[in-house]
């Protein structure tokens, strides 16, 4: 029986690298995978899943109006979703149905919370619906386990207000532990 998996972490933890490794594992056994990433995240080009190890793959994109159930997955062995925090609650429900009604494993990777510690709606629903939830670990600059992230400006100063979604990588965000998150 297929499952819905959610693998979450702070930024710069290797989520995209793991997703690309899983895709490679399936494809090395001549199995077909369906790759998705958010159309919002265009740091490396629209429809590109890119790891910080400079591994890159083309991908399908989803936006708020995308319906995962409308696609014909045919002989797809696994559905892999990067940047899953940008999904809508309805899309998280669609992926749950896809795993359980069409018997296709779905593995989602994303952030749990934003730079203010607020949950992303897509992630909140994945945490509720996923059959298997796994935290991918990374470390804070102080050496503790990073579970949060902060937004920084061009001078490296913390930004505490602003829109929930602002695309950026290491130049805009840092993974931090809870203690450093609350440090003023």
From Swiss-Prot:
Active-site residues (renumbered): 83 (proton acceptor)
Pfam families the UniProt entry points to: TK
Amino-acid positions noted as binding ATP in the UniProt annotation, renumbered to this chain: 9-16, 82-85
Key words, A-Z: ATP-binding, Cytoplasm, DNA synthesis, Kinase, Metal-binding, Nucleotide-binding, Transferase, Zinc
SUPFAM superfamilies linked to this entry: Glucocorticoid receptor-like (DNA-binding domain) (SSF57716), P-loop containing nucleoside triphosphate hydrolases (SSF52540)
Compartmental location: Cytoplasm
Alphabetical list of InterPro entries matching this protein: P-loop_NTPase, Thymidine_kinase
Residues noted as binding Zn(2+) in the record, renumbered to the chain: 140, 142, 177, 180
Enzyme Commission number(s) from the entry: 2.7.1.21
Gene Ontology biological-process annotations: DNA biosynthetic process; thymidine metabolic process
Catalytic activity as recorded in UniProt: thymidine + ATP = dTMP + ADP + H(+)
GO molecular function terms listed in the Swiss-Prot or TrEMBL record: ATP binding; thymidine kinase activity; zinc ion binding
GO cellular component, one term: cytosol
Enzyme class: transferase
Disulfide partners: none
Family: Belongs to the thymidine kinase family.
Subunit structure: Homotetramer.
Protein name: Thymidine kinase
Organism annotation: Chromobacterium violaceum (strain ATCC 12472 / DSM 30191 / JCM 1249 / CCUG 213 / NBRC 12614 / NCIMB 9131 / NCTC 9757 / MK)
Lineage, broadest ranks: Bacteria, Pseudomonadati, Pseudomonadota, Betaproteobacteria, Neisseriales
This protein's encoding gene: tdk
């Amino acid at each position: 029986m297929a499952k819905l998996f959610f693998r979450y972490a702070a930024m710069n933890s290797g989520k995209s690298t793991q997703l690309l490794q899983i895709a490679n594992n399936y494809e090395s056994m001549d199995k077909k995978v369906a790759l998705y990433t958010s159309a919002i995240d265009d740091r490396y080009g629209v429809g590109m899943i890119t790891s910080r190890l400079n591994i890159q793959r083309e991908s399908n994109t989803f936006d708020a109006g995308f319906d995962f159930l409308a696609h014909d997955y045919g002989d797809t062995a696994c559905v892999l979703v990067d940047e899953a925090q940008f999904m809508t609650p309805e899309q998280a429900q669609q992926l749950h149905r896809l795993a359980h009604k069409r018997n296709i494993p779905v593995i989602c990777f994303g952030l749990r919370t934003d730079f203010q510690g607020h949950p992303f709606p897509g992630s909140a629903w994945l945490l509720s619906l996923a059959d298997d939830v796994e935290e991918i670990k990374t470390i804070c600059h102080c050496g503790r386990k990073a579970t949060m992230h902060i937004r920084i400006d061009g001078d490296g100063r913390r930004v505490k207000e602003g829109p929930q979604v602002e695309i950026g990588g290491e130049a805009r965000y840092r993974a931090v532990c809870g203690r450093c998150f609350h440090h003023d």
